[in-house]
Amino acid sequence: MRLTAKQITWLKVCLHLAGFLPLLWLFWAINHGGLSADPVKDIQHFTGRTALKFLLATLLVSPLARYAKQPLLIRTRRLLGLWCFVWATLHLTSYALLELGIHNLALLGSELISRPYLTLGIISWLVLLALTLTSTQFAQRKLGKRWQTLHNVVYLVAILAPIHYLWSVKILSPQPVIYATLALALLALRYRKFRQWWR
């Protein structure tokens, strides 16, 4: 049975809650001692992981809609992508304001150059920014065929963001490896699409 437009609307409501509730939890954890002895790192990792989760969810929509024969699922992809950008922005903001400090933002440029994993992170964020700004139907009409070409760059983020996570941790743990593996699996599902590009 295929999902109806009304069911998709309710699904979108649930996805908005999924994007917002982690923020409420984070505020609660900050104010009630729910973080570790290094709360700044906790906030950075939590926001970064949440952005990655929404990135993976965004990449999952197309193959899921195709294999499950639920074409209306595609309508949730933009919403998931926007939440990915929101959490990626919170991740970047937490680094800039909590790690560097508001009085040391001038150091951000040198930090990006001296730490390659930060370079990958900012490239990913800039791509997400471009995709967010052009996610409207108006932008799609204006860009025409170029719109799809631009939005295919999300696959670059699917490569760079997990590498950014892997590179940023001092001690390799299963979590970043799992995220990287899931990203590769979702990219592998698009093998035929990538193969057509290179013909």
Swiss-Prot record:
Keywords: Cell inner membrane, Cell membrane, Electron transport, Flavoprotein, FMN, Heme, Iron, Membrane, Metal-binding, Transmembrane, Transmembrane helix, Transport. GO terms for biological process: protein repair. InterPro entries: Fe3_Rdtase_TM_dom, MsrQ-like. The chain crosses the membrane at residues 10-30, 82-102, 116-136, 153-173. GO terms for molecular function: electron transfer activity; FMN binding; heme binding; metal ion binding; oxidoreductase activity, acting on diphenols and related substances as donors. Its cofactor is FMN; heme b. Belongs to the MsrQ family. This is Protein-methionine-sulfoxide reductase heme-binding subunit MsrQ.
